[in-house]
């Protein structure tokens, strides 16, 4: 397996090194994105043109827009390569994000679940590695649940529950059914930033939520 984790850093997100033809790019590893998205300038560097097909896509804020599509010849990640990948194309301004420290969002591409789900991945926070290899199963043989993104089963208060893993989010989000299960719920104003739009909202939150994963808290 080849480590393709990028050295780029932004808000504890994961970034990978991508090779498209003779062009190198940095992509956000985003299991919450149904399709891979690239910036208009990256499409230009690839000397590719958008297609006539337009698809509707939403971001973290629920904003839905119509985006052009394009087919890029290949996406290479480490030693694996996906041919003829259809992607969404968005304006460069949609990637113009910065954090509280003034660091600039380093990616010009969102690597979506349409590509990620085709391969086998191994992540180690300790070793700072995200490795990829060919999968024993094709994307067509994934269960209906997994086709929407990876699922884990953490434990809270002695009970397991299903949670979807979205590596494009910087925080965990709970459904409304948790209101009656959690103590000390507070509210704060926060900015929800996503590709294409951001907004300030007053949201409930808990400072500490103890979950167990495979007998580890």
Predicted features, each with a name:
Residues 1-217:
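Pepsin/retropepsin-fold aspartyl endopeptidases
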């Amino acid at each position: 397996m080849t480590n393709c984790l990028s050295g780029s850093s932004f808000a504890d997100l994961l970034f990978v090194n991508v090779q498209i033809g003779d062009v190198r790019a940095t992509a956000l590893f985003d299991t919450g994105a149904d399709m891979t998205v690239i910036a208009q300038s990256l499409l230009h560097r690839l000397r590719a043109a958008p297609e006539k097909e337009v698809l509707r896509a939403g971001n973290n804020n629920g904003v839905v827009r119509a985006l052009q599509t394009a087919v890029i010849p290949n996406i290479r990640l480490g030693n694996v390569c996906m041919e003829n990948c259809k992607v969404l194309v968005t304006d460069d301004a949609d990637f113009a994000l910065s954090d509280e420290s003034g660091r600039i969002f380093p990616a010009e591409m969102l690597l979506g679940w349409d590509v990620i789900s085709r391969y086998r991945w191994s992540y180690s926070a300790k070793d700072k590695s995200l490795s990829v290899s060919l999968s024993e199963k094709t994307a067509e043989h994934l269960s209906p649940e997994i086709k929407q993104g990876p699922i884990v089963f953490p434990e809270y208060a002695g009970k397991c529950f299903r949670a979807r893993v979205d590596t494009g989010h910087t925080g965990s989000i709970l459904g409304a059914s948790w209101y009656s299960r959690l103590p000390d719920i507070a509210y704060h104003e926060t900015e929800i930033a996503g590709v294409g739009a951001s907004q300030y909202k007053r949201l409930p939150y808990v400072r500490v939520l103890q979950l167990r994963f495979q007998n580890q808290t």
